[in-house]
Design a protein with these regions (language model features):
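His/Met- and acidic-residue-enriched segments that coordinate or traffic transition-metal cofactors
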Residues: 2-166
C-alpha cells in the first residue's frame, strides 16, 4: 500500500468523522456530528496553516479556522441552552491530532484540498437535513444560517481541488 494512500485514508478519517452520523435523526446526533466535524476543521486548518506552502491554501485554512471556531461556539451555546450534551473539545482535538501525527509534507496540499471537498459535501448534507427537519427550532435556525457558509466553503474547496487536488 502506498504512503500516499495511507495518508489519504487517514485524512478522510479525520474529516469524515461525522459521516456515519450525518444520517442520524436526533438533535443530539446532529450536535455530536456537527461538533466533531467542526473541531476537525479547526485542527486540520491550523495544521494546513503550518504545513502548506501555498498562499491560497493558507488563506482557505485560515477561513476554516475562523468560521468553524465561530460556528462551534454558537452550536455549543445553543446545545447548552437546549440541555444537549456537547462532545468534549479537548478529547476530540486529541483524537484528531493522533490521527494526523504521521502526515508528511510531500502531498499535504493535495490531501488537504481533496478531503476538504469530501468533508464539506458531508457537512452540507448534514446541515441541509437538520435545517429541513429538526425538531428543535434553535438547531433548525442554526443549520439554516450556517448552510450558506458551508456551501461557500465547498465551492472554494472545489476550486482549490481543481488546482491542487485529485
Amino acid at each position: 500500500m502506498s504512503n500516499l494512500f495511507l495518508k489519504r485514508v487517514g485524512f478522510s478519517m479525520v474529516l469524515g468523522m461525522a459521516s456515519l452520523q450525518a444520517m442520524a435523526a436526533s438533535s443530539d446526533d446532529f450536535v455530536d456530528a456537527a461538533t466533531e466535524a467542526g473541531i476537525a476543521e479547526v485542527v486540520t486548518g491550523k495544521l494546513a496553516l503550518d504545513k502548506s506552502k501555498d498562499p491560497q491554501i493558507k488563506t482557505f485554512a485560515q477561513q476554516m479556522v475562523t468560521d468553524h471556531t465561530q460556528a462551534n461556539q454558537k452550536l455549543g451555546d445553543i446545545a447548552r441552552k437546549l440541555d444537549i450534551s456537547v462532545p468534549d473539545e479537548a478529547a476530540l482535538t486529541e483524537k484528531v491530532k493522533k490521527m494526523i501525527l504521521k502526515w508528511r509534507d510531500e502531498s499535504f496540499d493535495r490531501s488537504y484540498v481533496n478531503n476538504q471537498v469530501e468533508a464539506h459535501e458531508k457537512a452540507v448534507e448534514l446541515f441541509r437535513k437538520e435545517a429541513a427537519s429538526s425538531d428543535k427550532a434553535e438547531l433548525k435556525a442554526f443549520a439554516g444560517e450556517t448552510l450558506p457558509k458551508l456551501e461557500e466553503h465547498l465551492k472554494h474547496a472545489k476550486e482549490l481541488q481543481a488546482k491542487h487536488g485529485q
